[in-house]
Amino acid sequence: MAILFALFAMVSFTACSSDDDETPSTEDIKTNIVGMWQSTHISGWDYDDTDEENLIKVDQDIPEADSYRMLFKGDGTCKEYYWDDYKWHLDGTYKYEVSGNKIIFYDSHGDIEGTANVLSIKGDVAIFELTLEEGPQDKHRTTFKRVY
């Protein structure tokens, strides 16, 4: 849950595309999101590894040991996994819904855990973008590859 909190509870994602034809539709997302996705790259802004969690500019690939996976099921549930001790561990289970080009995540009480704008979802690659708590100028993008 710490990873989902760090990624999604930072508030919401905002699309930057100036071409509306590039923004995936609700149906595109619903059709293509089902499956296991692994984070592979981050860009924009992120938090450093200190206790202060300072904002830093990033544009880097994510080593597998630091990546996480999200399993989206067709029934509207999502599971998040992190890598530790040479295996994947369940980190949290959520419900999700797709509205426009957004994926809205709900905790077990039905409260919104986070919202992600899907900038792109084509083939085996998806790009999500979020706005960090510090303000709308602080965007964080995560690229995912479909594992299966």
Where are these regions (language model features)?
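Bacterial N-terminal signal peptides that target proteins for export
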Residues: M1-I3
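C-terminal motif of bacterial Sec signal peptides marking the signal peptidase cleavage site
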Residues: V11-A15
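Lipid interaction determinants
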Residues: S18-T93, E97-Y148
